[in-house]
Amino acid sequence: MNSGVLLSESETDTSEVSGRQSELISGDESIKGKLEEFSAKLNELRLADGNSDGGDEEESLSPDTKSQREESSENSENVSRSTSRPPLTSSIVSSVEREQLKSQVKVKIRLQPIGAIPQIQPRVCQISAHQQFLALTRFLCKRLKRKHIHCYINNAFAPSLDQNIGDLWTQFKVNDELIVSYCETVAFG
């Protein structure tokens, strides 16, 4: 009974969690690898532009000096690829890492029925903070086998379906849980 979006507190399958963590780590490594390749290509393009400007200078150098210069540029390329990145690439890497951390953050949601609608077990679930409220309503419709569900935050208001659950949680949490009441018909207003 574990959906791709919601996890209950009682369902703690460590192999599933470790599998997800390994997927995230491998995805992180592949993104970093692609960014490093992109950075290396940019460095090569910059070096090619620098070599075309100083073409007359290289013609006057002896073959020994040219080979020493090529070796030193190769060594500096290897060092720059492994230790430092251009500022643009560094900012891209940091933004990708922030997005991955944001997607890993899960918030607790307490589900409370209103009226004659059945209660969902377990009552407390977790969902990714970056998900829209629509994902939660779809989960409830699927779990309760209903076409329409009306949801309310803290029995006070019905959020829009495109609102971010993480934002709702930070603004309206009670004891680190977002209380979502649900019913089959309009309950308030």
Swiss-Prot record:
Residues 15-24 have a biased composition (Polar residues). SUPFAM superfamilies: Ubiquitin-like. GO terms for cellular component: Atg12-Atg5-Atg16 complex; autophagosome membrane; phagophore assembly site membrane. Keywords: Autophagy, Isopeptide bond, Membrane, Protein transport, Transport, Ubl conjugation pathway. It is a peripheral membrane protein. InterPro entries: Atg12, Ubiquitin-like_domsf. Its main location: membrane. Coiled coil: none annotated. Transmembrane segments: none annotated. There is a cross-link at residue 189 (Glycyl lysine isopeptide (Gly-Lys) (interchain with K-145 in ATG5)). One of its GO terms (biological process) is piecemeal microautophagy of the nucleus. GO terms for molecular function: Atg8-family ligase activity. Forms a conjugate with ATG5. Belongs to the ATG12 family. Ubiquitin-like protein involved in cytoplasm to vacuole transport (Cvt), autophagy vesicles formation, mitophagy, and nucleophagy. Conjugation with ATG5 through a ubiquitin-like conjugating system involving also ATG7 as an E1-like activating enzyme and ATG10 as an E2-like conjugating enzyme, is essential for its function. The ATG12-ATG5 conjugate functions as an E3-like enzyme which is required for lipidation of ATG8 and ATG8 association to the vesicle membranes. This is Ubiquitin-like protein ATG12. It comes from Kluyveromyces lactis (strain ATCC 8585 / CBS 2359 / DSM 70799 / NBRC 1267 / NRRL Y-1140 / WM37) (Yeast). The gene is ATG12.
